[in-house]
Amino acid sequence: MELVAGCYEQVLFGFAVHPESEACGDHEQWTLVADFTHHAHTASLSAVAVNSRFVVTGSKDETIHIYDMKKKIEHGALVHHSGTITCLKFYGNRHLISGAEDGLICIWDAKKWECLKSIKAHKGQVTFLSIHPSGKLALSVGTDKTLRTWNLVEGRSAFIKNIKQNAHIVEWSPRGEQYVVIIQNKIDIYQLDTASISGTITNEKRISSVKFLSESVLAVAGDEEVIRFFDCDSLVCLCEFKAHENRVKDMFSFEIPEQHVIVTASSDGFIKMWKLEQDKKVPPSLLCEVNTKARLTCLGVWLDKVPDTKESFPPAAEPSPVSKEQSKIGKKEPGDTVYKEEKQSKPNTKKRNLAGDSKKATKESGLVSTKKRKMVEMLEKKRKKKKIKIMQ
């Protein structure tokens, strides 16, 4: 198990987790050991995603970098977007989905690292996306004030819902029976069977991250030191606790045998791991913490395994019928605009390989490809500076 975190300082941190409990009275305590620090990008990191083999990072430098966690080498880089990478999501070990400020959503083959589909998803920026547990649907939100549903089996848009405001987070529940849409400090809870808002929760500050701890309990972090657990059925706050000395930037939740853990990262530089109690009204207990001394932006946990998932996308050769989930989520709600999108831009069929050798990466080839990329970036910066001087 390994914690990975990105920061404004362009660095990716890796910390090995040792869950063996230490003797500390009745309090269980884990240990964190620094494994690596890697100068990953030429701008601040904005997103991270993990599967059983790779960690991928997105940045304001418009690139996605891939790291082989088993070999502990940089595997290469994906260059397709022309804006800050805002979100990265793996589905199983086979596919990666990326969203960016250029309005594109890209579906990548996580074996060959080819761009299988490039979709103009939003008229503005793509701010967040979430994949349904079935792998057949995805939701995305953007700066065009829409919530969009994607048929991942066919690789096309299914429905567009006008939500009248710019949302910055959308998240499915573990069973996919409901989802939340975050607008500033407001949480709208949608039920899949009715496609309507069943309730609204208001947080004190702007929300930066949410994670479902169960089908009905939602952890909420924002521009403050406190984390709150809300019941999505009763809409009440079950508990709140001070997690950090500064605003919480990201959270990650996972389960291992006899343990349910939530990990938090903050602008104060700390990454902390907390043990969740069965009764979510009881605040979690601190397992371990580490100070990176950096301004953290994003967080992931590499578990060396992923849950069993049925690979339902990328686009199939033949169109599939609209699923029950799509029919439900596409229901019209009074006061909202919901319609099925007819036109779709042509898919980008051009294959885009990793930077460097397309063969199986070795430690040497991975390093060479990284050096070449950095040299090109330096030359490009010098050319731009010369052009500015000539213009002056």
Question: What is each stretch, according to the model?
Answer:
Residues 25-28, 35-40, 74-80, 115-121, ...:
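Short C-terminal beta-strands that terminate individual repeats in beta-propeller domains
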Residues 47-53, 71, 82, 88-94, ...:
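Loop/turn segments within WD40 beta-propeller blades
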Residues 1-4, 52-56, 65, 74-76, ...:
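Structural hallmark of WD40 beta-propellers
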Residues 153, 157-243:
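Eukaryotic tandem repeat interaction scaffolds
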Residues 18, 69-72, 110-113, 152-155, ...:
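Short loop/turn segments that connect beta-strands within beta-propeller blades
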